[in-house]
Curated annotation (Swiss-Prot):
Isomerization of pyrogallol to phloroglucin. The keyword Metal-binding applies. Binds 1 molybdenum-bis(molybdopterin guanine dinucleotide) (Mo-bis-MGD) cofactor per subunit. One of its GO terms (molecular function) is molybdenum ion binding. This is Pyrogallol hydroxytransferase large subunit. Heterodimer of a large and a small subunit. SUPFAM superfamilies: ADC-like, Formate dehydrogenase/DMSO reductase, domains 1-3.
Length: 875
């Protein structure tokens, strides 16, 4: 028996110590710091108390359970080929996914060698490129990948795919949506996709906060992003100081249950009715910051007339908001008065931005409403800001270690943030080179990920904005079409990473797409046999980040979330050790691409003769790490806690704006040409625009969008209980926020330990069902009891779920988390009820507005009933 070895690694849920014995992982734990060698923690003095964080990291539930996913029996053990697929004969696309209908998808496949798999795929690549050109090859990854800056999708994936040539399916700004498509036009921050900066807000809040309004915000669930439970202690500190916590969310979320003093539950799609009523109260009672608004707002007077009903005849009173939202007028009015009276921070979304309300048909106006309220109370002044308690920690922002979005080994300046700093530090242009794309550009061919089915199954398609359109406010207004002029339609799909069926919208479309005869070849590169993997012709088994080398920083994304390591209580850089050999015949993504690069005769350019560990060393040397230790020292220790910078100047977010000064925060935007004399916001006027100049220009050019007018307006949700005829047939509004225990699909299914958490899945007759939460009044009216199997359905599909009867929703609202990893159709895939729990089958594929090409998956009407066992093969 061997000794236990402690190694280091990291994950989407935090860095860990990994304990390995005899070549197997036996446990993972958060990192505990060594006081003798690791840098001391920061301290904040506020209200006569000293605050300092624990001397350790925290991890999310899915990281705590990662061992069960590594050794899951649903790991793909070796390359496989669909039995009914003959690359030299009958391809039978109509039989893709046939095994799903028999509840035995493995039976569709036969084992093949890596050599045979690569030969088939390379032959198809070459055939398709000769016949149609590289634009006929489509690929896209999942949003959240295995952690590590070398292995991440912006890095290894783009390095290879750019060399091979492909059409990329751009990701919609799914975390930002309303902020991106609406908020950006009101206050800029395009380099953050419409979210505000958060620097030094923890100290500001500890010193000044009297109330925090958490609106569509559940930081105990979403960890900000990637940051485990780092911010939990900050809310404990604030509660100990007597700060009032108010929550506005249709569902009494996990953070609210822990710390809420008051909870408001509006009907789905009506949050902005509350924000208008609060603004109305402030206007009528003269309880807003008039001097601040006069100096910093554009179009406010005209907007105020609209709120007061002078222009449309409908005053946005608290009584009006009650009719829309179901929240009593007296409570809305009381909240407005307390807000105006106290030093109040607005926690809009879980990051200071984001939030499930932004992913809805009213998301644009909700985000603009949040900015409007913050502006009316003087955001940026001490005691008034937009802050969700998840960021704003006093760390060293000058120490340079790039996040995963800075491109890693790709150096792709078009599709990552590599061009800001990192590409120039990573590649010398003599011995090592980046891998840019001449196809995946605004002038080449690309498609929206949300419309992959339409592009494959249909003809021409048009949309606005290339993915995360953050280069400038007006970039998202640029029009695109598929196929791009001179480029081919898609004939091959190389699917990479986690499932779309549980994460996109109206996802029966994706299941149907795979069987379309225009799609000649499908490859799936995945770790687990889940989601849409059973639709592939060839399956390539990838490994987890615990089975390869990598390097990273705790929670550091960068890119459109700059400096977001401030989610964490310490900056922790990790060497991600190859803890074990890859399970079965699986390989790292880098080694998979290296195999293909060799057969495509581009291996020398792709790898430059380096393995992953050599790339990690090159990466290390391109950061500020060598200022503190050598590569050998880092390799031996495995992690580094970045010390505090005693000379750092504190720069509270938006304080510069409130005081009319030059911007002094370490943020990397706006560009110099987007400001006048380096003052003001990124907008044309430099002010918060209640009437957006950019949208006004768009309208004057003939692009009229009734769901995104130039003035911040109350626009009813287009699929709502009050304003939609569909409500007669489907009377329940469905909320589908991010899951509590898994990271989107990461952690769910896979026979992982998460399946045994009774608030994640419920076992009925030996099968673990996804949960739908139902108010007791709605349940009783339908004869539904706690634990019953129910069918949730609408015109888009049916999903079989376990009912959880609760009082944590108001009547008329149901709640089920998005991002199920299991797709288990009871009949024909894409045309029958799913019992895996893919709730996004029921969400609309309609864009958030005509020219705002984002998802509105929190806008959905459904009906529920006790399940009678039928397959419902009717779609």
């Amino acid at each position: 028996m061997g000794e236990v070895v402690r190694l280091t690694n990291s994950s989407t849920g935090g860095p860990v110590f990994v304990y390995v014995k005899d070549g197997k992982i036996i446990r993972m734990t958060p990192m505990d710091f060594d006081d003798a060698v690791d840098a001391p923690s920061w301290k904040i003095e506020a209200r006569g108390k000293t605050f300092t964080p624990p001397r350790k990291t925290s991890i999310a539930p899915y990281t705590a359970g990662f061992k069960s996913m590594i050794y899951s029996d649903l790991r793909i053990p070796y390359p496989m080929k669909r039995k009914s697929f003959d690359p030299n004969g009958e391809r039978n696309p109509q039989l893709r996914g046939a095994g799903l209908s028999k509840q035995d998808p493995w039976s569709d496949y036969e084992r093949i060698s890596w050599d045979e798999a690569t030969d088939i795929v390379v032959a198809e690549i070459n055939r398709i490129k000769h016949a149609y050109g590289p634009s006929a090859i489509l690929s896209t990854p999942s949003s959240h990948h295995m952690w590590g800056n070398v292995g991440y999708r912006h890095s290894t994936y783009f390095r290879f795919m750019n060399m091979m040539g492909f059409t990329y399916a751009d990701h919609n700004p799914d975390s930002w949506e309303g902020w991106h498509w609406g908020g950006m036009h009101m206050w800029g921050f395009s380099w953050r996709l419409g979210n505000p900066e958060q620097y030094d807000l923890l100290e500001d809040g500890l010193k000044h906060a009297e109330m925090i309004v958490f609106w569509s915000s559940d930081p105990e669930t979403n960890s900000g992003i990637y940051a485990g439970f780092e911010s939990n202690i900050r809310r404990q500190w604030l509660k100990d100081l007597g700060v009032d916590f108010v929550f506005i969310d249709p569902h009494m979320n996990h953070t609210a249950r822990l710390v809420a003093d008051k909870w408001f539950s509006p009907k789905i799609g009506t949050d902005h009715a509350l924000s208008f009523a609060i603004a109305y109260t402030w206007l009528k009672e003269d309880s807003y910051d008039k001097e601040y608004v006069a100096a910093n707002a554009h179009g406010f007077e005209e907007w105020a007339d609209y709120v007061l009903g002078k222009t449309d005849g409908t005053p946005k009173t608290c009584e009006w908001a009650e009719e829309e939202s179901g929240v009593p007028a007296c409570e809305i009015r009381a909240l407005a008065r307390q807000w105006a009276k106290k030093n109040t921070y607005l926690a809009a979304g879980g990051l200071g931005g984001w939030g499930g309300a932004c992913r809805a048909s009213h998301g644009i106006e909700w985000a603009r409403g949040m900015i409007a309220l913050a502006t009316m109370q003087g955001m940026g002044k001490p005691g008034s800001n937009m802050w969700s308690t998840t960021q704003g920690v006093p760390l060293d922002y000058e120490f340079y270690f790039p996040g995963y979005a800075e491109g890693g080994i790709s150096g792709d300046c078009e599709n990552s943030a590599a061009g800001f700093k990192f590409a120039w530090r990573m590649f010398d242009g003599k011995t090592t080179f980046p891998s840019p794309s001449n196809l995946n550009t605004s002038a080449g061919q690309h498609i929206p990920r949300l419309k992959i089915p339409e592009c494959i199954m249909g003809g021409k398609f048009q949309w606005s904005g290339k993915g995360f359109a953050g280069g400038d406010i007006s970039h998202q207004l640029h029009q695109y079409e598929y196929p791009a002029p001179g480029y081919s339609k898609i004939k091959m799909f190389w699917k990479y990473g986690g499932p779309h069926l549980g994460t996109m919208t109206a996802t029966n479309r994706y299941a149907k797409m795979y069987t379309h005869d225009s799609l000649e070849f499908v490859v799936s590169q995945s770790i687990w046999f889940e989601g849409e993997v059973p639709f592939a012709d060839i399956i390539l088994p990838a490994c987890t980040n615990f089975e390869r080398w990598d390097i990273s920083e705790f929670a550091n994304c960068s890119g459109y979330i700059p400096d977001n390591y401030q989610l964490c209580n310490h900056r922790v850089i990790s060497l991600q050790a190859k803890c074990i050999e890859p399970v079965g015949e699986s390989m790292s993504d880098y080694e998979i691409y290296r195999l293909f690069a060799k057969k495509l005769n581009i291996e020398e350019m792709f790898s430059e003769g380096k393995d992953e560990l050599a790339w990690c060393e090159q990466y290390f040397n391109a950061t500020d790490m060598p200022k503190y230790m050598t590569w050998d020292e880092f390799f031996k220790k495995g992690y580094f806690v970045v010390p505090d910078n005693p000379n750092r100047k504190k720069t509270v977010a938006l304080r510069w704006f409130a005081e009319g000064r030059e911007k002094d925060t370490p943020d990397w935007g706006p560009r110099l040409n987007n400001q006048v004399c380096r003052k003001g916001l990124q907008t044309t006027t430099g002010k918060v625009e209640f009437i957006a100049t950019s949208l006004k220009n768009f309208e004057e050019q003939g692009y009229i969008d009734e769901h995104r007018p130039s003035m911040h307006t109350y626009v009813p949700a287009w699929e709502s209980q009050k304003h939609s005829p569909l409500a007669v047939k489907y009377p329940l509004g469905m909320l589908s926020p991010h899951p509590r225990f898994s990271m989107h699909t990461m952690g769910d299914g896979k026979n992982s330990y998460m399946n045994y958490i009774k608030d994640h899945r419920v076992e009925v007759d030996g099968y673990k069902y996804w949960i739908m939460r139902v108010n007791s009044i709605d349940a009783e009216a339908r004869g539904i009891k706690n634990g019953d199997l129910i069918r949730a359905y609408n015109d888009r599909g049916s999903v079989i779920l376990a009912a959880q009867v609760t009082e944590c929703l108001q009547p008329g609202t149901v709640h089920s988390y998005e991002s199920c990893a299991v797709y288990d159709p009871l009949g024909t895939a894409g045309k029958s009820a799913d019992r895996g729990g893919c709730i996004n089958i029921l969400t609309p594929d309609r864009y958030i507005s005509k020219y705002a090409c984002g998802m509105a998956n929190n806008t959905a009407l459904v009906e529920i009933e006790k399940w009678d066992g039928d397959k419902y093969e009717i779609y």
